[in-house]
Regions:
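Short Cys/His-rich micro-motifs in 6-15 aa windows
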Residues: 258-267
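ABC family nucleotide-binding domain
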Residues: 4-218
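ABC-family P-loop ATPase nucleotide-binding domain
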Residues: 1-14, 225-234
């Protein structure tokens, strides 16, 4: 049984708007185990950004516990939180956030500064990560010479630099065209399956979410639904559409007669 890398217990977050209290998260509970790929979905204002900021130790809960690798970050001072962010997490952003004056390799090396690695070790590690995400031969290119999809691959390589406990991905396909969206989500899914990388992803993209193991629907600050993603359903020999039993090699579900692909809207029923 995989151990939890994230445990959230009765999490509440309230903001003050003048003298009025505005609840953003309400009694939320969540456990993510090592090696999981989890998608968090929900409409605007549902609390996704607030939740991601709290998981990422950028914001603090009003009440409740947030345990990252067993450490309660909700009670830690800021001068210790930056070490948690550096050592325990990797971040992937919608807008890539690469430094334009650094090469792809140098962007990946940056999080390793001050972590005890020599410059040659940093360079070797960065080159290995860029090769892993399919960018061999592009490591000396600056961001402006890379496509949007390639820039996001660099960002994913950077997020892995310090072997984090998990990756937080905030709308990682949001600024990409349809082809690059598919390539990036397949890359994340492959990292999860082959490297055991734990990924927590916030997304509006139903097809991206469907490629995860577990999908959570957030509404009004609460998790109101949970569903298996396509990969977990297929792994468990279940149709992703109706949940009926399937066997290896099936292309059509024998129960609902639908193709064995992810439904376009996972929470529509």
């Amino acid at each position: 049984m995989s151990k939890p890398v994230l445990q959230i217990e009765n999490l509440n977050k309230t903001y003050m708007l003048g003298k009025r209290e505005v609840p953003a998260l309400k009694g939320l509970n969540l456990t993510v185990n090592a090696g999981e790929f989890v998608a968090i979905m929900g409409p605007s204002g549902s609390g996704k950004t607030t939740l991601l900021n709290i998981i990422g130790a950028i914001d603090k809960p009003t009440t409740g516990k947030v345990l990252l690798d067993g450490i309660d970050v909700g009670k830690m001072p800021e001068n210790q939180l930056y070490k948690i962010r550096r050592d325990k997490m990797g971040f992937v952003f919608q807008t890539f956030n690469l430094l334009p004056y650094l090469s792809a390799r140098e962007n990946v090396e940056l999080p390793m500064e001050g972590r005890g690695k020599t410059k040659s070790e940093q360079k070797k590690r960065a080159s290995e990560l860029l090769a892993m995400v399919g960018l061999s031969g592009r490591e000396n290119h600056r961001p402006q010479r890379l496509s949007a999809g390639e820039q996001q691959r660099v960002a994913i390589a950077r997020s892995l630099a310090n072997n984090p406990a998990f990756i937080l991905a905030d709308e990682p396909t949001g600024n990409l065209d349809s082809q690059n969206k598919q390539e990036i989500i397949k890359l994340l899914a492959n990292l999860n399956q082959t490297q055991g990388t734990t990924i927590i992803m916030v997304t509006h993209d139903s097809q991206a979410a469907n490629h995860t193991e577990r999908m959570l629907l957030l509404k009004d600050g609460k998790i109101i639904k949970e569903k298996e993603g396509l990969h977990m359903a297929m792994k468990n020999n279940k149709c992703p559409n109706c949940g009926g039993s399937i066997k290896t090699g099936d292309e059509i579900c024998p129960i609902c007669k639908k193709p064995l692909i992810a439904p376009e809207e996972p929470f529509s029923s």
